[in-house]
């Protein structure tokens, strides 16, 4: 079945919000062996909505539309649909009853006048129940194309999609094939290098597709396998995933939706290790990432933001003479910070970062973007210099991710011994 999606709203085409609905729909369909072939986004304009429906209708068996079903003057979807399909707009009693019932649930007192725009539905349509919001959706058939219309509110749309739209399509798309997919999350390699390493995995007619998506500072590698049976798709995916993991090695830090902090945390918990942090240029970003993971209290002891030189000395025991002699941004100071936080916290691992995030403060010897990362463990202390050159925010993000990756890689190597 050829399925297209249409997102409606001025807020989308003006960049005020990101269209998450389209991604939600596409992912949900993939999970059921169906795919989106085209996607359009238009503003709150009746002519544009009508043109988009006509355009997609010529090449689609089904169109899933979100947005424009609200009560305000710029919600124009139902009017556009009525005009585009030659239907009349009428008060749908079922939609009206639902509207009043939901308004009462939301605390609107009896007797308060409620605009009934959301109960105006084109004739010859079937309602799509909305268990969590005021606006019912609806679907219809026009020129051989199923058309589904749902609110743009993501929480409402998602429920309606899974409870009504996908079951309807799945029942009618009898020719759909089994699709299985897997995301491999990669850090520490550029997109061209990842592409080079994965060359040859996808062969003509093998039933596999590969996609790379840069989501700074990581790269998501998506493997999608398609076959006549679930078992066939899973076998194709398994072989491809094994090959990709072997080629990318430890640069694959997780699969699916696990982030780098979660990957490091999983290893810390599994190995019974504890962690303490001393941060300068990142200002607590590493600790924020660590503590965003549920259960981090099982391994994270403390984090200290020692931004100034005095704080480095008082809190971490870094000698003032060392700072004066080598500079706050130096391998020697980074190592002293890592050892200091490990000793004061009594942790298994002590990680420290110090650097120049800019835009000022750089020198010829130590330009903006110079960062030192140090990891103190029972095995000793490892310190390295990095030069990240993408601006203040990106320097801090890259430092944070590199530090987390250091923790992850150390624990991987430790478990392999």
Swiss-Prot record:
Gene3D superfamilies to which the protein is assigned, alphabetical: 3.30.70.2860, CinA-like, MoaB/Mog-like domain
Q: Which InterPro entries match?
A: CinA, CinA-like_C, CinA_C, CinA_KH, Competence-induced_CinA, MoaB/Mog-like_dom_sf, MoaB/Mog_dom
User: From which domain of life does this come?
Assistant: Bacteria
Q: To which protein family does this belong?
A: Belongs to the CinA family.
Q: Which HAMAP family does this chain map to?
A: CinA_B (MF_00226_B)
| Database matches in PANTHER family | NICOTINAMIDE-NUCLEOTIDE AMIDOHYDROLASE PNCC, NMN AMIDOHYDROLASE-LIKE PROTEIN YFAY
Q: What is this protein called?
A: CinA-like protein
| Species name | Pelobacter propionicus (strain DSM 2379 / NBRC 103807 / OttBd1)
